[in-house]
Amino acid sequence: MTQMTALICPEPGALRLESRPRPEARAGHVRVRIGHVGICGTDYHIFGGQQPYLAYPRVMGHELSGRALDASSDGTVAPGDLVVVNPYLTCGTCRACRGGAPNCCEAIAVLGVHVDGGMCQEIVVPEANLYPAHGLSETAAAMVEFLAIGAHGVARARLRPGAETLIVGAGPIGLAAAIFAGIAGAQVMLRDASAERLALAAGVLPQARTEQVGQEARVTYDAVFDATGSIAAMNRGLDWLGHGGTYVLLSVVKGDLTFPDPEFHKRETTLLASRNALKSDFDHVMACIRDGRVPVDRLATHSTTLDQAAAMLPQWAADRGALIKAIIHV
């Protein structure tokens, strides 16, 4: 067959299935038969028209697992292998790439955002962007990328065992950060405005403490992570940070952040942005899943098929209160 099915977002608020040519093999790349796709907040934003600098139509999907159709040139991937797709396409030559930080490549293109992604039956990606997922289920493999974003933020913070750590925002990225902060030995407090989200979080991480916005105890923390996507919440982060602490911004928003310099300075605050993830983060996540330290079965709360995704995704976009991660079975 030379054609495949793809889920297209032709414009904000619209989705349709479309027949497209299957990608052709080319040097240095591997074709992947997509098996599972995690739906990210970015996908909901693309559907809703809230993603800036995006050109429609677009095939969404960057949280991907599938089966390799070709062998990689170095022999690490064989046909039929279950693989996790690293969706960050990088130039390899800019300052960030040369310095070991391709996650913030100056010319980065993310599958499903800047170029067409994986809500389809097959894609072709650079072989360096495929990581064998031996020992993982196909569903778990599709969740590695979003978990790696949380793991990367935690790695940036260099948490010490026992560090009192506040994570604001109990969506998927906040939960990912909470999971890996706990794995690093931190004492985790998870905060959100939604009682429903906090109840979900408690089911995923029963060892973490939770509190609702508006009911906070007036205490400070060694590290604060923001995963809200709210400028107001991000600007308030210093209120909860102890002296000598680290503030990590997992969220990115369009706008300016403002901190009172005396509060920022007297804490000798370490302020960190965290963007995407590195191969080492993907590897760490997969190792932790294999060891049973990541409750992947409790994270995948909803699922659908590619044929039904055009009907289900708008429903989930309208109300994500009871949803952690929805998975499309291709």
Label each residue range with its predicted role.
Residues 2, 235, 279-330:
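C-terminal hydrophobic helical "lid"/dimerization subdomain
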Residues 23-37, 50-95, 134-136:
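Glycine-rich beta-strand-centered segment in the early N-terminal region that forms part
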Residues 50, 193-194, 253, 277:
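Residues in the short beta-alpha loop(s) of Rossmann-like NAD(P)-binding domains
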Residues 136-213:
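Mid-domain Rossmann-like dinucleotide-binding core that forms the NAD(H)/NADP(H) cofactor-binding site
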Residues 231-291, 330:
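Glycine-rich phosphate-binding loop and adjacent beta-alpha segment
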